[in-house]
Structures are given as C-alpha cells and as structure tokens.
Amino acid sequence: MADVMRVAVAGASGYAGGEILRLLLGHPAYAQGRLAIGAVTAAASAGSPLGEHHPHLTPLAQRVLEPTDAAVLAGHDVVFLALPHGHSAALADQLGADTLIVDCGADFRLTDAAAWERFYGSPHAGSWPYGLPELPGARERLRGARRIAVPGCYPTAALLALLPAMAEDLIEPAVTVVAVSGTSGAGRAAKTDLLGSEVIGSARAYNIAGAHRHTPEIAQGLAAVSGRDVTVSFTPVLIPTSRGILATCTARTTAPFSALRAAYEKAYDAEPFIYLMPEGQLPRTGAVIGSNAAHIAVAVDEAAGVLVAIAAIDNLVKGTAGAAVQSMNLALGWPETQGLSVIGVAP
C-alpha cells in the first residue's frame, strides 16, 4: 500500500461527489497526510473552480474541475465514481486492476442481468462486491476488494429496516416499502418538477407500482439473507426537504414482538452506525442529517399481523458518500468508522 493514498473523485460537481469530498476532508488520514485528494472531475462543468459548485468546501475552492476521462483518473490509488447510471462501466474498464474503484452509481449493483436490462435498458456490465457492510458476510467481501458497488439510497434504508427479520425467517417474503426522500436524491441537474415552486408545500409519489429502479435491488438484498425469492412493493415519495430518507417497511408476521426485537438487537448490537431506537421511540430524518447513522425502530401491528420497521438515513451520507467512505476504509484495512460520524446536525 502506498505511503500516501492518492484519491480522485469523478463527478465532483454533483451532490454525491461533493459529499464524498466533504467526508474526505474530515478524514483523519487526510489530516495526517496519509490521504491526498488528487483529481476532481466533471463533465459539463470541467474547467470551472470547484468552489463555484460547492462553496462549503473551502479548502478545495480553487481546484479546477478536470474532464472525466481515464487519462485524468489514472495513477490514483482510489477512484470514487459519482456518475450518472450507465457511465461507470466503460470508465472502470480503462483503469488498472490495482486501483480501488468505488462506484456510487448503479452499474454494478445488480447480479441479475435480466433485471438490469429491464430497469436500466442497457447491457449488464456485471456485479461488484456490494458496499453495505451491515449485510451479513459483506465485510469479508469488502476487505481487500478493488471494485465496490455502493448501494442505492432507498435500498440502504429498506434493507437496514428489514434485514434482521428477514434473515431470521420472522416475516413473509413479500414486503411493502413506502419511503419519503428529499430532492437531493434526484441529483443536481435542473428539472422543472424539482424547482422550489413545484416542491415546496407539496409531496408526491413517483415511479410507483414496481417501476422504480431500486425495486430489484431491495429484492436482491432481502433474497440474499433469506434464501428465498422476495417480492417488493416499493413506493417512493418526494417531500420538500433537501436531505433524508424515512422508509416505512411492512410485512406479514406471526412472530411475537419479543422475538422480532431480539432479532434486531442481535443483528445490530455491535454495528457502529446502527442505532436501534428504544421501544416507543421512532426515527426522524432530522436526527441523522450529516451523519452516517441509521436510526431504526421496529413494532408489530398485532391486529393486522404485520411487522412495521422504520429506518431514517441521510441519503447523501449513509445512502451514498458515507457508505462509499466506509467501504473504502474496509478495503484499505483502515478502521471502518474513520472519517464518519454518527452525530447528526440538528435542528
């Protein structure tokens, strides 16, 4: 391993790329000189100062965004790809096998080629180790890895909410997920339906009835721990806030609350970024903003025979950039929690 790890961020002008840079600037390896931020790249914004896009990143404000191409990214020890879906695969193929590539896009998340082609409409590029360390067995696959696929933000929330119950066979393999999210999850490109006048004071569902691209990813993660095919009904809802996801997940169960609570305590007791709420308390997005934490609550609707599991995360941290840095730490053999906080910014 190099004495100083040179890190590049492709797609640095976007929200995910900017959040990766924010976390890297606060990483102890950066403060100690063991991690250096190299190329920061963009597409249409290439040639402009990073500070025009992320004025909060003052230590890097004068950095000029370079074009996103393999020649610019070559020679770095770690490359974060924060690119639109479908753009990572070709670029990754041009980088060396020894380069740690952490892809925040969807290109390598799905193992099922047919599912990829159905939801994304292009040839499947393959799959990489999945960057959700809390998934059973994931840490072993991430340690020493040189290719990592960061999970989607909605799947992160839904999987963390449901994994313990599904892994212990305490719920039926048919789940419903309704998740509200802020506008940053849609990226930074200008869109009419994301204008302030369209979003403020309003909430709307979108990509309903199995149409959202994160649906097969949620099903894949649940199937991996249950050993059964899992059906997922997923409804995303856009709300007028910039950050945060609150996922309310339900599934049929005959298990008593005590058994379900015990399963969650067993699964998450030693997890550094998971906070299982005390009984009677419920997660809120405001408590996790800016942190890599996931706050989770579990309850049973006894009259309906339904598990209700709720997860709150910051979609830009635990849902993207934080998971990317957490996975980088594992891949490099560094303490998993370095550079990541469980303390949110409130109010």
Swiss-Prot record:
GO terms for cellular component: cytoplasm. It comes from Mycolicibacterium paratuberculosis (strain ATCC BAA-968 / K-10) (Mycobacterium paratuberculosis). Belongs to the NAGSA dehydrogenase family. Type 1 subfamily. Catalyzes the NADPH-dependent reduction of N-acetyl-5-glutamyl phosphate to yield N-acetyl-L-glutamate 5-semialdehyde. Gene3D superfamilies: Dihydrodipicolinate Reductase, domain 2 (3.30.360.10), NAD(P)-binding Rossmann-like Domain (3.40.50.720). One of its GO terms (biological process) is L-arginine biosynthetic process. It comes from the Bacteria. It is an enzyme of class 1 (oxidoreductase). It is found in: Cytoplasm. Pfam families: Semialdhyde_dh (PF01118), Semialdhyde_dhC_1 (PF22698). NCBIfam families: argC. This is N-acetyl-gamma-glutamyl-phosphate reductase. The active site is at 153. HAMAP family: ArgC_type1 (MF_00150).
